[in-house]
Amino acid sequence: MYLKRKVDDFLKKWKQDPDRKPLIVKGSRQIGKTESIKHFAMEHYESIIEINFVRDEKYKGIISDGYEAANIIKNISLLDPSKKFLPGKTLIFFDEITEFPEIATSLKFFCMDRRFDVI
């Protein structure tokens, strides 16, 4: 059973904004941020690319070729070819970025790229 949270409405408004930028969701631990984002993603995207930097440390190497969106997408695809990047239909969800703060630098490149939504 899913419990509706205040962030749910915010995520929907963010998705409707044609000029949306990558989103960083902050909050206390264990309040349901990840669950809310996953629920939102299942309702609004055809493809969800979830990268959890605690559970999947291998993804910390995705910036090895730089912070440009194309390089990061290529490196994620090399690590897991089953991940589908569909322009305009994919949410890339970087979870637990406090464990890999360097990935935040890539957000401006994803903003310029605009093919994928990023949280």
What annotation goes with each model-predicted range?
Residues 1-119:
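Phosphate-binding site recognition
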